[in-house]
Structure formats: C-alpha cells, structure tokens
C-alpha cells in the first residue's frame, strides 16, 4: 500500500516527517520562552510529586473515583461506554509536543484529586522533604498564574495538536 501511495504521490512520506519535525520545533521553541518553560517545569514538578510512589498513585485513583461518583450522583457527568475512566497523570516527554498536550489535559481532568493528594502528602508525608515539596507543589497548582497558564496552554496546544494529527 505504501509503495502505491508513494508511486502516485512521492512526497506523501514527507508529510509524516514534517509533523514530527513540527512537534520537535514546538518543544524547542517552548524552551526558549521563559514563562512557557517555567510552566512546563512546574507541571512536571507537580506530576512528579503526585506520582512519586505507588501509595500516591493509589490515593490519586481513589480520589478520582470518589470525585466521579460524586459528580455522577449530582448529574454533573454523563455515563456511557468508555466515559469517566480512572486514569493517571501523564508525564510530558522531551520530544513529542503531543505528550505535553496530554500531560496538560490529564492534569485538568484530575485537578481536584491531584490537589487532594498534594494536601495529604503535605500533611502526612514520610519525610520533611516530601512534605515541603508537596507544600510547594500545592501552592503552585492553586496559583492564578499556573491555572491561567494551564488553560491557555491547553487552548493553544489543542490547535497545534489538531494540526499535527492532520499531518500524520
């Protein structure tokens, strides 16, 4: 099939390469803009703290399940096949712009449970370092600047994600 397509349109192969190249350039450009670079550092820090142990991951899943149950009980969520799955926070990769977008979307989807887990680590962490890191992450995730950047980056990256998907 690939040979047939390449015979008819010899440049078709390069569209996929262009999509990957675009993602690499977007990641590189994001490191050049200090507020965006800082946002992704903070995002990764929060995800690292919350995903630091199996206990934290279990606590995150339990908090997410409780939130889904609560929202279903008050008719805030619709039910259906594949809806309301319990997931995990996605860590952004170093080379794929799409992974940065998935990381943002996963945090937005699990914002409440993530804040709850950070609160619990802050209060019941096993070391002072863990408690201190959770305290910093909790302040960060609840700051206006971070929340604004989170939603702004979701909107911007949603547009570029559609473009990258279309090129692949």
Spans of model-derived segments:
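Alpha-helical structural modules in large enzymes and assemblies
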Residues: 1-168
């Amino acid at each position: 099939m690939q040979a047939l397509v390449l015979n008819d349109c010899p440049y078709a192969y390069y569209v996929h390469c262009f999509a990957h190249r675009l993602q690499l350039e977007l990641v590189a450009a994001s490191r050049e803009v200090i507020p965006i670079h800082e946002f992704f550092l903070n995002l990764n820090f929060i995800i690292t703290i919350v995903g630091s142990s199996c206990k934290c991951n279990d606590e995150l899943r339990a908090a997410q399940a409780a939130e889904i149950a609560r929202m279903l009980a008050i008719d805030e969520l619709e039910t259906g096949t594949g809806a309301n799955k319990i997931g995990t926070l996605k860590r952004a990769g170093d080379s794929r712009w799409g992974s940065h977008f998935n990381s943002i979307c996963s945090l937005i989807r699990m914002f409440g449970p993530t804040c709850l887990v950070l609160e619990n680590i802050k209060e019941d962490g096993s070391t002072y370092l863990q408690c201190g890191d959770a305290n910093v992450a909790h302040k960060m995730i609840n700051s206006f600047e971070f929340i604004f950047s989170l939603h702004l980056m979701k909107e911007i990256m949603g547009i570029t994600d559609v473009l990258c998907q279309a090129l692949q």
